[in-house]
């Protein structure tokens, strides 16, 4: 039993850098293209859902630290990525990745949670401007006479909802595409294997 548990831990540890790489590539692509979405949480959710909150949290932390190298303003948002790893674990245990129709609902829920955390960071530390594509929305709204907090809220909510709905649909299909013989070896694999 302990040998099997060590293998599970080794497999989960193996997936952490893969999750970080997926996040970093998605996040950097969104920043470079100035997209109004982030695309930097897919790896966190997949690893958190399959391997548990600890590996998911580490993926969120690693991604946040690496992304902050090229765009230091992203560092305070690392806490949100870490929270995603924990939430992915809870969502897996509650069967929230079991049907495609749940993905947009999950995206809305996660988008609202992340907006509530991101708005105070963005408005307080950066005056609404982080240097991502979402800053375009803030600029437009502030030019129209909006104050920084409501403009930041609308910008964050728009970006987060769009991003998280897209990401959670992708995550659903990634999880469904994984072979059962692989998934069953992971700590949360039992939540993704259907009994016949």
Map each language-model feature to its residues.
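Alpha-helical transmembrane segments of multipass membrane proteins
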Residues: 22-27, 59, 63, 67, ...
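Interfacial aromatic-anchored transmembrane helix boundaries in multi-pass membrane proteins
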Residues: 24-39, 61-102
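A short hydrophobic/aromatic micro-motif that marks alpha-helical segments and, especially, helix-coil
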Residues: 55, 66-69, 177-179
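A generic short alpha-helical patch detector that favors 3-5-residue windows
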Residues: 13, 17, 79, 145-146
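Short glycine/serine/threonine-biased micro-segments
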Residues: 25, 46, 50, 54, ...
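Membrane-embedded alpha-helical hairpins and interfacial helices in multi-pass inner-membrane proteins
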Residues: 32-34, 74-76, 97-196
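Hydrophobic transmembrane alpha-helices
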Residues: 1-50, 54-65, 85-93, 171, 175
């Amino acid at each position: 039993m302990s040998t099997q548990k060590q293998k599970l831990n080794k497999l989960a540890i193996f997936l952490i850098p893969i999750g970080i790489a997926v996040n970093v590539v998605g996040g950097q692509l969104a920043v470079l293209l100035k997209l109004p979405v982030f695309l930097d949480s897919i790896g966190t959710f997949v690893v958190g859902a399959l391997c548990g909150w600890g590996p998911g949290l580490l993926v969120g932390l690693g991604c946040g630290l690496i992304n902050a190298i090229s765009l230091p303003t992203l560092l305070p948002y690392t806490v949100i990525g870490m929270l995603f790893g924990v939430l992915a674990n809870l969502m897996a245990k509650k069967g929230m990745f079991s049907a495609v129709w749940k993905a947009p609902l999950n995206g809305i829920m996660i988008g609202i949670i992340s907006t509530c955390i991101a708005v105070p960071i963005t408005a307080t530390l950066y005056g609404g401007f982080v240097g991502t594509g979402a800053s375009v929305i803030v600029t437009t709204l502030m030019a129209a006479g909006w104050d920084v907090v409501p403009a930041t809220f609308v910008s964050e909510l728009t970006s987060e909802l769009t991003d998280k709905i897209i990401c959670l649909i992708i995550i659903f299909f990634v999880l469904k595409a994984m072979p059962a013989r692989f998934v069953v070896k992971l700590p949360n694999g039992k939540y993704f294997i259907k009994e016949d």
